[in-house]
Amino acid sequence: MGLPWYRVHTVVLNDPGRLLSVHIMHTALVAGWAGSMALYELAVFDPSDPVLDPMWRQGMFVIPFMTRLGITNSWGGWNITGGAITNPGIWSYEGVAGAHIVFSGLCFLAAIWHWVYWDLEIFCDERTGKPSLDLPKIFGIHLFLAGVACFGFGAFHVTGLYGPGIWVSDPYGLTGRIQSVNPAWGVEGFDPFVPGGVASHHIAAGTLGILAGLFHLSVRPPQRLYKGLRMGNIETVLSSSIAAVFFAAFVVAGTMWYGSATTPIELFGPTRYQWDQGYFQQEIYRRVGAGLAENQNLTEAWSKIPEKLAFYDYIGNNPAKGGLFRAGSMDNGDGIAVGWLGHPIFRDKEGHELFVRRMPTFFETFPVVLVDGDGIVRADVPFRRAESKYSVEQVGVTVEFYGGELNGISYSDPTTVKKYARRAQLGEIFELDRATLKSDGVFRSSPRGWFTFGHASFALLFFFGHIWHGARTLFRDVFAGIDPDLDAQVEFGAFQKLGDPTTRRQVV
């Protein structure tokens, strides 16, 4: 036919059988990719340390999505939370991957069948004998079925009535597990961090979809609306479908980047705003303060801080620190975390407790500045030693560790003190293994960052696609050059005001 590459889809424009075929093939490709990617990730995933080497540090992309829907066991005998299991059942990670691949194969065969047997009676208008689709009726059918699926997910899967529930955790990502969720019907259901909203919104949206589907199945659109919105044109379906997809992509880009109940930090890693706001640091200090109030000493209070909580409070886990085009997992960047060294507390020779000013998200380098509790600068690592007033050597800074591997150890050697001050800029200090994966020391983003970038980019692209195809279908007659008034509108001198038919010049 000699069509250019960007026009090849016109071959299914008036061919309902093959239009169905290519959509089934698309589903086969999507399901096949998901299943294959899951098997690849399972082949490279190391489940041995869910605290310091969780799935998001290893760059897993599809495993977190399976996990948040209730899959936690593997046929390899491990559980995502670290325990051993004996009977994982059919719906393990491998089982879900296999189901996607089998489904992909069936869709592949169905696509071939519909490509070969494209001229089916069901696609023909019995009055004209030509291929025709009743698009408003098809819209009603799809809306009804989508509503049933949406309602079923919210009412059965999420609530645990017939299903596992979803991943639910505390605000600091420490106690996450799969559990059933009761719908939240009050105003709290609109809080994006309340899991109950997932159940209630799916039930409500599903109910609305079922009712709307029945409406569109039983009520025909008015003729003027049908013609005005070009409801008989398949490109109208394309345009409105693209609109639904780009809107959803923008929404999930937001819920992923800013965080929500559907994107738990245990599965996707922390958000950048938790570093910016010192979210985990505040909770750590609150716990230490509570311990001191119970007459614990500093060592005891810091030793009770969960390693998982301390690890969140490390800039290397900030998804905004990795460049968008730095390929690889976080472990390929700063290395595999081995252990928490403990919390360093710096003091000058006068006994002031000093705090290292932390590096903001978008800095690659940052001056090492130590301030006291009032925010007054007491020490630093100067750029020019000749002009220094607050150097570690001059001020006599020492460091002592509480909790972690270096618990109870103190250093007064300026070189060592400066080393730990630099590392304290990046949050809690961890021992990182860079040898195993030949990690290069350059921070990487987490799957949270990749998902957001990908969905925001495609949403923008699809937004333009919606405008393009919407304009094509609405102004099809104009673009085709069959508008009877088109020549008159653009003819120079036909109107006093170009294109305004009310100002037509009178012929004398």
From Swiss-Prot:
Alphabetical list of Pfam families matching this protein? PSII
SUPFAM superfamilies on file: Photosystem II antenna protein-like
List the keywords (alphabetical).
Answer: Chlorophyll, Chloroplast, Chromophore, Membrane, Photosynthesis, Photosystem II, Plastid, Thylakoid, Transmembrane, Transmembrane helix
Q: How does it sit in the membrane?
A: Multi-pass membrane protein
Q: What is its main location?
A: plastid
What biological-process GO terms show up in the record?
photosynthetic electron transport in photosystem II
Which GO molecular function terms does the record list? Answer: chlorophyll binding; electron transporter, transferring electrons within the cyclic electron transport pathway of photosynthesis activity
Gene3D superfamilies reported for this sequence: Photosystem II CP47 reaction center protein
The record lists the membrane-crossing segments as 21-36, 101-115, 140-156, 203-218, 237-252, 457-472
Which GO terms of the cellular component aspect does the record hold? chloroplast thylakoid membrane; photosystem II
Copy out the cofactor comment: Binds multiple chlorophylls. PSII binds additional chlorophylls, carotenoids and specific lipids.
- InterPro entries in the cross-refs: PS_antenna-like, PS_II_antenna-like_sf, PSII_PsbB
Location in the cell: Plastid, Chloroplast thylakoid membrane
Source organism superkingdom:
Eukaryota
State the family it belongs to: Belongs to the PsbB/PsbC family. PsbB subfamily.
Under the subunit heading, UniProt states: PSII is composed of 1 copy each of membrane proteins PsbA, PsbB, PsbC, PsbD, PsbE, PsbF, PsbH, PsbI, PsbJ, PsbK, PsbL, PsbM, PsbT, PsbX, PsbY, PsbZ, Psb30/Ycf12, at least 3 peripheral proteins of the oxygen-evolving complex and a large number of cofactors. It forms dimeric complexes.
What function does the entry list?
A: One of the components of the core complex of photosystem II (PSII). It binds chlorophyll and helps catalyze the primary light-induced photochemical processes of PSII. PSII is a light-driven water:plastoquinone oxidoreductase, using light energy to abstract electrons from H(2)O, generating O(2) and a proton gradient subsequently used for ATP formation.
From the Swiss-Prot or TrEMBL record, give the protein name. Photosystem II CP47 reaction center protein
Q: Which organism is it from?
A: Phaseolus vulgaris
